[in-house]
Amino acid sequence: VLFRSKTLNIHPVKAEKDDTDLALGVEQAIQKGYTEIDIYGATGGRLDHFMGTLQILFKSDYIKKEIIIKVIDKQNEIMLLNTGTHQLHKSDKYQYVSLILVNGEVILSLSGFKYNLNHQHLEIGSTLTISNEVNRSMAIIEVEKGQVLQMRSRDLE
């Protein structure tokens, strides 16, 4: 967890505990009043830890408080989109946008994309919303029902 300050207090925790180091760090950042948190270095290595990182995005307290948490690496940026309207600016860094269904059914509308959708009903297992592209200065994602993981990505050169 990266804090925007000149000093960083490190609080060691026991190796054997009921949460991951990252989950504890995110909780501490939120307790300090941060409402936007960028997480770096959490996508490589063990898949169980990566999946645990994604679970943090779904914590109901964070959703209720509208905490924005992004998981970022050299090729991707992942964040949770809940029901509502979301603006997405075209990016020179990330060419592709994928919307991953994570639970139940989703109803999506997309505008400003290469492949737009209008009140599209989707269920788990669908790959319809993989590898889209923003083709205007700003695109709109309307999550009418459900939740999706928004993944912005780029090919490595």
Protein language model features and the residues they cover:
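Short, structured coil segments at secondary-structure junctions
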Residues: 5-7
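Short Gly/Thr/Asp-enriched flexible loops that form oxyanion-binding sites at enzyme active sites
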Residues: 44-60
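Long, charged alpha-helical interface segments
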Residues: 76, 81-157
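Short phosphate-binding loop-to-helix
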Residues: 11-31
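Short acidic/polar active-site loop segments enriched in Thr and Asp
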Residues: 35
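Short, acidic/small-residue loops that bind anionic groups at enzyme active sites
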Residues: 61-78
